[in-house]
Amino acid sequence: MLSKYVYGLSLGHFVVDFSQGALAALLPLLIAQHHFNYAIAATLVFAMNLVSSIIQPLFGFLSDRFRTGWIIIPALLITGLGFGTLGWDNQYFLLITSCLVCGVGIAAYHPDAAKLVNGLADVNQGHAMSVFSFGGNLGFAGGPITVTLVANALGIYGVVLFILVGGGVALLLAHYFPAMRRQSAQHWQQKRQRESDSPVPVKDDWRHFAILACVLFGRSIIFYGLNTFLVLYWMHILKQSNTSGSLALSVLFIVGATGTIIGGHLVDHISAVKTIRFAFTIMPFLLLAFSLTKSVIVVSALLLPIGMLIFIPYSAIVLLGQRYLPNQMGLASGVTLGLAISIGGIATPFLGQVADATSLITVFFILTAVALIPMGAAYFITEPTIK
């Protein structure tokens, strides 16, 4: 039976990733309030995502060197404070500062929370990591809808409620943290005992970790490409409404969240490597079919398995990263949950330039080609031996 503490950590994951998804929906209100242009408004998203992605491996490194599990509690407080003040900041400098503060909280939460989940999981590591990931995916998907409803009801100042949400979840995890730490520490102590009894020392496998990063880079570009251009594709290529396109994007996220849970069970039953290979072997063919048709019915039908397959290998990738670097698990979590994800955000402007120069259809053909990278790399990774 899965530890109840995993669900608590998943709730915290929901809170920190909620802010990333909600910021994009907050931009139109900030533009109207401060008379920003699109470029200036976009720098707010860039600032939050960049700082959270870049410094996440640093927090992972510190987690491996020191006992920093407690940092998940101030991380939630900082995230809530940063996002909750966005509606009240009256200067661009203050808005950027709030986004940076929020980004630091996001970066601080992921590595130690992922390590705790691994320690609490015992034998059901895939299921535990999928529950943890589900919380983050649900937060990312639910953020735009929730913040829009709050802003419509209370105005942009209503986002201050997020400070209370972050504080409430922080208090909940603070209450359970001593028990979580004891249970997780017991797991790692038993693991170290098994390793000390083994004549072969446990070494970090950097070569396979680098190959795994290539898998994640490809997934990140596909995810951000769909996240950025799906609504536009729905409007300009399929000739549907903006509302219809937004609904399609919501369906992608909802199906994806379900895929996260399915992926966790697959990891426990068929292994992480086979789960990754299964998803990325099929992915290029679905994206190619998506790019070749202009039928709304066919594209809508293809969207379901595409959304599922993007998220099915997510937990497997995070777990495999930790297994490849057993002596650097915090760093591994920081890279797989942070730095590697930012690659997709960096690639998105280049895809936008391609769309301007050619068409949105070309962008989806490029995403199809990109899908060949994780497909090929998946067959060069192996399942590490777990002692």
For the regions a protein language model found, what residue spans apply to each?
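Residue-level signature of mid-helix packing/kink "hotspots" within the transmembrane helices
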Residues: G21, N49-P57, F140-A141, F253-I261, ...
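Extracytoplasmic gate region of multi-pass secondary transporters
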Residues: L23-A24, R207-A257
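Conserved MFS/SLC helix-loop-helix module at the cytosolic interface between two early adjacent transmembrane helices
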Residues: I54-N90
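Helix-to-loop junctions at the C-terminal end of transmembrane segments
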Residues: I55-R67, T260-S271, A355-D356
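Cytoplasmic helix-loop-helix junction between adjacent transmembrane helices
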Residues: S98-G135
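Helix-loop-helix hairpin linking two adjacent transmembrane segments in secondary transporters
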Residues: F132-A179
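C-terminal membrane-cytosol helix-exit motif in multi-pass small-molecule transporters
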Residues: L164-K191, M375-T382
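C-terminal transmembrane helical hairpin of 12-TM major facilitator-type secondary transporters
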Residues: V267-I317
